[in-house]
Regions:
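Tubulin/FtsZ superfamily GTPase core signature
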Residues: 1-164
């Protein structure tokens, strides 16, 4: 049909049981057969983000937010014009027939905001593996009118440096 299909899903927490995990893994394998790209967020990684006081509802809400941000991020790449536009053809060239994919997100304010956000995205605890062997990378930078040219360059340079050391 020619449509670009991207699946963004979670893998259950270990405490949800082996049966649920088996079902999820089978579903993920099925998705890989029909989707160009599948991004799997392991819910267990959320345990590294939260504190001991995080309730079950907050944990599941956090998992849902990660999924939402993943879908929204990809959608925004295509639909929201930026200073350096990424269009559907760019997204398709990286994600078509890509198989498994990773997604890192970073956010920061103030001094060293770009470096902090970039390092958060590259080293995100939600990433199950590294970028090693990546065939393509999509980078999206959002900022206010004060976002500087050198800051944007820092994102690209930091990513390249991280990718070279893998």
């Amino acid at each position: 049909m020619g449509a670009l299909t991207i699946g963004v899903v979670t893998r259950p927490f270990t405490f949800e049981g082996k049966r649920r995990t088996r079902q999820a893994l089978a579903g993920i394998e099925n998705l890989k057969e029909v989707c160009d790209t599948v991004i799997v967020i392991p819910n267990d990684r959320l345990l590294q983000l939260g504190d001991a006081e995080l309730s079950m509802m907050e944990a599941f809400r956090a998992a849902d937010e990660v999924l939402y941000n993943g879908v929204q991020g990809i959608t925004n790449l295509i639909t929201i014009p930026g200073m350096i536009n990424v269009d559907f053809a760019d997204v398709r060239s990286v994600m078509a027939d890509a198989g498994s994919a990773l997604m890192g997100v970073g956010s920061a304010r103030g001094e060293n905001r770009v470096m902090t956000a970039t390092e958060q995205a590259i080293n995100s605890p939600l990433l199950e593996t590294t970028m090693e062997g990546a065939k393509g990378v999509l980078i999206s930078v959002a900022g206010g009118s004060d976002l500087g040219l050198m800051e944007v360059n820092t994102v690209s340079y930091t990513h390249l440096r991280a990718h070279e050391t893998l």
